[in-house]
Amino acid sequence: MSLDISQYPVLAQANTPDELRQLPQAVLPQLADELRGFLLKSVGKSSGHFASGLGTVELTVALHYVYNTPFDRLIWDVGHQAYPHKILTGRRDAMHTIRQKGGIHPFPWREESEYDTFSVGHSGTSISAALAMAVAAEKEQAGRKVVSVIGDGAMTGGMVFEAMNHAGDLHNDMLVVLNDNEMSISENVGALNNHLAQLMSGRFYTTIRESSKKVLKGMPVIKEMAKRTEEHLKGMVVPGTMFEELGFNYIGPIDGHDVDALVETMRNMRNLSGPQILHIMTKKGRGYEPAEKDPIGWHAVPKFDPSTFEKPASKPSNPTFSQVFGKWLCDVAEKDKKVLGITPAMREGSGMVEFSQRFPKQYFDAAIAEQHAVTLGAGFACEGLKPVVAIYSTFLQRGYDQLIHDVALQKLPVLFAIDRGGIVGADGPTHQGAFDLSFMRTVPNMVIMAPSDENECRQMLYTGYCYNDGPTAVRYPRGSATGAPQIEEMTALPIGKGLIKRQGQKVAILNFGTLLASVLTAGESLDATVADMRFVKPLDVELIKELANSHDVLVTVEENAIMGGAGSGVLELLQQLKQPMPVLQLGLPDEFIKHGDSGEIIAELKLDAAGILEQIESYLA
């Protein structure tokens, strides 16, 4: 149910940017307050990304007030912070459906709104896209402006600097807003800097600056002296030298919660030529005390009552697979100081908080730099250390070349703990772990494991830790484990060997991963044999031969794309054995899986027990 908009009188007049731009500037602070209040209650009712959006309220208001969106292009990096943008661009009354099946998308999405000029979800893409749009705008000669908004966390990714380096060379008109909400670049915030930013972006300063460049053209010594003098004067109060060296004109830092200062500065910058960067300082979770104190904990929230100032206590459940991994990592690190944990800025999500605290010298946060994280692991392995790279399936895509070139090619023993394999649910198509089994299967020297429960997960992680002949991967899903009684003793599994879990007849179901419980339920109804294959690569050749010889039909089940996945490996093996037979492959279809509750999606894809049974019976009919 949408909120009563009558409680937000100014926001009620700004359902679209066109309406927003009709408001007098004097009411923008009130609009920002109402927008923040609406966001607070809306996410409380729907769940979703929370703290980031609270920090970008004033920025969002200013951007849509100054720029003629959607004609002017506005690109958000990642998109966690774009909830206020969605509210102001005609989706206010649908915010209660965000991240839900059939509801609005969790991130900016081109198919959803003309105001979402570039679909996002992963970090570091906005400046590349903005540069391309700026080049296109210049060719079009229609006066279109281009703005990208990127957080300081995303600035750790190499793609960002690749794009900035190119933008500085091409020198097209574009604005990059650096939303610095971690104080990681500068703490020089206050009235002086706000005033300086407006001064530096004003016509007088920019005219003098550009005129000086023209006058000094062809006089390299004097030009260099003038440049250094300018940088020295600016550098006393602003940290812009790095951006200037990349070819950007740097403005800031300014208070990102002063909507009037943002509007005036952006108005000044709107018609500046060349690439510009506006550095703003914001507070993640702004306006809600618990989120301000713990922005990481309040990054994303379930449904909650904002008036309690507490997130609802989670119901007692089984540990998550991430927690199972984190405990295992601590257990082995206690006994082996060569064990190193690496994460690309996903410490909390990957279950590595305790490890980072107990073993700080063995913990490495590579920041949002997946390529670097993978090759960092390769380098450690070269020196006889035991690197464990904890990474989400969707983010390993970004380190694929490094997986091949830097790890597998050299047969380096790097263990990949791949979290969020399969359906992740509410974050949608940018985050579903649909492809990892497919893209890893093709890589020589890889060993790939898919546990059916938390005990197998621990044993497989230990197997990867013990394996020294090349890289290993253990792939597990998001969310709670199965509740299997924990076996503390860790034993390395025989490589490439599966288990028969149920003996049946005619139909043999080969399970890869945590859908085993549903497969066993379907197997009971069919009186089918069920095998827990454990290894996606290498496959258990002898077991598959045995099952093929003793059954009429094989069925493969995996929470991965059918194309190129584990089932494809079974088909390839049967062809090599010259033993063709009916094989039904069940898994994710050849499409990007939309957002929604994980259970709902699994059921819709017919990968729950009832759906698996239905698909097999239909195939046999």
From Swiss-Prot:
Cofactors, names only: Mg(2+); thiamine diphosphate
Protein name: 1-deoxy-D-xylulose-5-phosphate synthase
Catalytic activity of the protein: D-glyceraldehyde 3-phosphate + pyruvate + H(+) = 1-deoxy-D-xylulose 5-phosphate + CO2
Organism annotation: Shewanella woodyi (strain ATCC 51908 / MS32)
Binding site for thiamine diphosphate: H80, G121, H122, S123, G153, A154, N181, Y288, E370
Residues at which Mg(2+) binds: D152, N181
SMART domains attached to this UniProt entry: Transket_pyr
Molecular functions per Gene Ontology: 1-deoxy-D-xylulose-5-phosphate synthase activity; magnesium ion binding; thiamine pyrophosphate binding
Keyword Transferase in annotation: yes
Keywords: Isoprene biosynthesis, Magnesium, Metal-binding, Thiamine biosynthesis, Thiamine pyrophosphate, Transferase
